[in-house]
Amino acid sequence: MAGKKPSHRAFKVADQIQRDLTQLLARLKDPRLGLVTLQGVEISPDYAHAKVFFSLLTGTPEQTQAALDQAAGFLRNGLFKRLQIHTVPTLHFVFDRSCERAADMNALIAKAVSTRAKED
């Protein structure tokens, strides 16, 4: 069943998990956590696992991932209290490098535009 599209309910649950995790993260006092932004959540069809994609404004990805992994039990417990589903997924945090790649692409485009302007 590889490639099966997630159901509408799975999207709704993933969205709710993202909103609830954002609120729960605000309560964490771990100094290793910088300014974390949750970019999205992908949930498995059986709701057993959730990949939580995050990006950073401050801090290092390694330290932040370690802090999030350590807080995963607390966060899952918080989700258990908030969600109205039978199985609360195990949380797997993944650093989302798409923001970094977008910034790199913007820098390359700006460099190309300035080089072309100098040639003209």
Swiss-Prot record:
GO terms for biological process: maturation of SSU-rRNA. InterPro entries: KH_dom-like_a/b (IPR015946), RbfA (IPR000238), RbfA_dom_sf (IPR023799). Pfam families: RBFA. It is found in: Cytoplasm. One of its GO terms (molecular function) is ribosomal small subunit binding. One of its GO terms (cellular component) is cytosol. Keywords: Cytoplasm, Ribosome biogenesis. Belongs to the RbfA family. HAMAP family: RbfA. Monomer. Binds 30S ribosomal subunits, but not 50S ribosomal subunits or 70S ribosomes. One of several proteins that assist in the late maturation steps of the functional core of the 30S ribosomal subunit. Associates with free 30S ribosomal subunits (but not with 30S subunits that are part of 70S ribosomes or polysomes). Required for efficient processing of 16S rRNA. May interact with the 5'-terminal helix region of 16S rRNA. This is Ribosome-binding factor A. It comes from Verminephrobacter eiseniae (strain EF01-2).
